[in-house]
Curated annotation (Swiss-Prot):
Belongs to the cytochrome c family. PetJ subfamily. InterPro entries: Cyt_c-like_dom, Cyt_c-like_dom_sf, Cyt_C6, Cyt_C_IC. This is Cytochrome c6. Gene3D superfamilies: Cytochrome c-like domain (1.10.760.10). Functions as an electron carrier between membrane-bound cytochrome b6-f and photosystem I in oxygenic photosynthesis.
Length: 85
């Protein structure tokens, strides 16, 4: 995974709602490690699936972003969650 690319993809596409690992729309659904674990969103596959398909207020990015960029962003999110954002 390319974490530098993941950070760029995240900044351009995700940070509007998820800056600093937070969630501007649904404040309890953050990208913090404990919340990701509690919602079974602490794997690359889980994050990639949700980014591609969307859920509730989150739009689908499949078709807007290539799979490699989504995977890099997912790796970046997990990396940042391990560091506590």
């Amino acid at each position: 995974a390319d974490l530098d690319n993941g950070e760029k993809v995240f900044s351009a596409n995700c940070a509007a709602c998820h800056a600093g690992g937070n969630n501007a729309i649904m404040p309890d659904k953050t990208l913090k490690k404990d919340v990701l674990e509690a919602n079974s969103m602490n794997t690359i596959d889980a994050i990639t699936y949700q980014v591609q398909n969307g859920k509730n207020a989150m739009p689908a990015f499949g078709g807007r972003l290539v799979d490699e960029d989504i995977e890099d962003a997912a790796n970046y999110v997990l990396s940042q969650s391990e560091k506590g954002w």
